[in-house]
């Protein structure tokens, strides 16, 4: 692998507008070859999407998805910059795909990492710090292990971090960036709600003997 220097990462970022981590990953994937890294970023839809990410996305659409059998339903708000784009096929297709993703991910609760409340993060840290397999380890080693475990756990709660259900080589965030690059506008997943039939309802379940007894008493 080529020597991936901070300057190389910065130069690639300046050329593409992509984030530092995306640039570093692109260079690692292409052995430090800048031209190939550029191509890698474009294929991921990242190169031009990042430059648009700071623009206001106040238009968009609220989509709904009902899974087969009508047992799971999703409402999702996807934002863009113009009403024209919101009505377009690329945007509407993305809205449907991301809504389907939410339906397929029952553990997902937040759009992005920065939406997770600090008390949830702290609670996860306390749980991990108290695990038996960490007892006796030096504090600095314990901190690193816990940091990795927490990052993994928090990513499980975040929609944008999920592997895309139709192509696990992509994350949902990659999918959104690809669409943004194609249409030339900033796109944001703002919020979502997932409904599961019967969720939160306590069912009165009889065993067979109780059911027979209740029939006899009628």
Swiss-Prot record:
Entry keywords, A to Z: Cytoplasm, Elongation factor, Protein biosynthesis
GO cellular component: a single term: cytoplasm
Coiled coil: none
Gene3D superfamilies per the UniProt record, alphabetical: 1.10.286.20, DNA helicase RuvA subunit, C-terminal domain, Elongation factor Ts, dimerisation domain
Subcellular location(s) of the protein: Cytoplasm
HAMAP family xrefs: EF_Ts
Function (record text): Associates with the EF-Tu.GDP complex and induces the exchange of GDP to GTP. It remains bound to the aminoacyl-tRNA.EF-Tu.GTP complex up to the GTP hydrolysis stage on the ribosome.
Family the entry assigns: Belongs to the EF-Ts family.
Name of the protein described by the UniProt record: Elongation factor Ts
């Amino acid at each position: 692998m080529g020597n991936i220097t901070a300057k190389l990462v910065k130069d690639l970022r300046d050329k593409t507008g992509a984030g530092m981590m995306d640039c570093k990953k692109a260079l690692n994937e292409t052995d430090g070859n800048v031209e190939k890294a550029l191509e890698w970023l474009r294929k991921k839809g990242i190169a031009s999407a990042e430059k648009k990410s700071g623009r206001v996305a106040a238009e968009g659409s609220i989509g709904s998805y009902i899974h087969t059998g009508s047992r799971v339903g999703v409402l999702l708000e996807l934002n863009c910059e113009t009403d024209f784009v919101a009505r377009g096929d690329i945007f509407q297709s993305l809205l449907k795909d991301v809504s389907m993703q939410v339906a397929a991910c029952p553990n997902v609760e937040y759009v992005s990492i920065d939406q997770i409340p600090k008390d949830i993060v702290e609670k996860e840290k306390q749980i991990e710090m108290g695990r038996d397999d960490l007892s006796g380890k030096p504090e600095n080693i314990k901190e690193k292990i816990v940091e990795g475990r927490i990052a993994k756990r928090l990513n499980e709660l975040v929609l944008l971090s999920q592997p895309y259900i139709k192509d696990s080589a992509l994350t949902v965030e990659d999918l959104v960036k690809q669409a943004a690059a194609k249409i030339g506008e900033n796109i944001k997943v703002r919020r979502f709600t997932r409904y599961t039939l019967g969720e939160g309802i306590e069912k009165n379940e009889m065993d067979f003997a109780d059911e027979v007894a209740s029939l006899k008493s009628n």
